[in-house]
Amino acid sequence: MSNMEKHLFNLKFAAKELNRSSKKCDKEEKAEKAKIKKAIQKGNMEVARIHAENAIRQKNQGVNFLRMSARVDAVAARVQTAVTMGKVTKSMAGVVKSMDATLKSMNLEKISALMDKFEHQFETLDVQTQQMEDTMSSTTTLTTPQNQVDMLLQEMADEAGLDLNMELPQGQTGSVGTSVASAEQDELSQRLARLRDQV
């Protein structure tokens, strides 16, 4: 097995590892969702919100790992073609040598930077790769969008068969529940007034 073939093997192995990490994140996300339901059932919205943030973070991280796995896999395919055709340039071989340590680190930013270097060795950079990079940089934010958290909380409450607004402890009712309650109160007041007028 030549050096280049060893590096190619490491690339393919890294793609599998990234894919495995993505699946692990999926598992963690499901576990966090189960914790959300339990917290909502106990009426503990603060804990439910924390688990919702964790679930969304795991989901985003899983997507990032999956995306990087696909990207490393695509580079491996290009290396395979270059090796098969005997067209491995010196500069390409240099970049490939630096891959091993970076791939072992499983650091998405370092792997991404390395993939950038490698892709520049190929003349045809497809548009798809650029789109992936843009999407990755926008999804690696550490903050969790609150609307996603709220939607996930509502979804978990629905699955648990709970009314999120009705079962919340006092002082934590959502604005939706409050506006519905006040509308119902207005309607009741009007009916009562009509009944009084009839008597």
From Swiss-Prot:
InterPro entries: Snf7_fam. Pfam families: Snf7 (PF03357). It is a peripheral membrane protein. Residues 183-199 are annotated as: Interaction with VPS4B. Keywords: Cell cycle, Cell division, Coiled coil, Cytoplasm, Endosome, Membrane, Protein transport, Transport. Residues 167-199 are annotated as: Disordered. Residues 180-199 are annotated as: Interaction with VTA1. Residues 180-196 are annotated as: Interaction with VPS4A, MITD1 and STAMBP. It is found in: Cytoplasm, Cytosol; Endosome; Late endosome membrane. One of its GO terms (molecular function) is identical protein binding. A motif (MIT-interacting motif) lies at residues 186-196. Residues 132-156 are annotated as: Interaction with IST1. Residues 10-48, 178-199 form a coiled coil. Residues 174-199 are annotated as: Interaction with SPAST. GO terms for biological process: autophagosome maturation; autophagy; late endosome to lysosome transport; membrane fission; midbody abscission; mitotic metaphase chromosome alignment; multivesicular body assembly; multivesicular body sorting pathway. One of its GO terms (cellular component) is plasma membrane. Residues 170-182 have a biased composition (Polar residues). Belongs to the SNF7 family. Probable peripherally associated component of the endosomal sorting required for transport complex III (ESCRT-III) which is involved in multivesicular bodies (MVBs) formation and sorting of endosomal cargo proteins into MVBs. MVBs contain intraluminal vesicles (ILVs) that are generated by invagination and scission from the limiting membrane of the endosome and mostly are delivered to lysosomes enabling degradation of membrane proteins, such as stimulated growth factor receptors, lysosomal enzymes and lipids. Probable peripherally associated component of the endosomal sorting required for transport complex III (ESCRT-III). ESCRT-III components are thought to multimerize to form a flat lattice on the perimeter membrane of the endosome. Several assembly forms of ESCRT-III may exist that interact and act sequentially. Interacts with CHMP1A. Interacts with VTA1; the interaction probably involves the open conformation of CHMP1B. Interacts with CHMP2A. Interacts with VPS4A; the interaction is direct. Interacts with VPS4B; the interaction is direct. This is Charged multivesicular body protein 1B1. The gene is Chmp1b1.
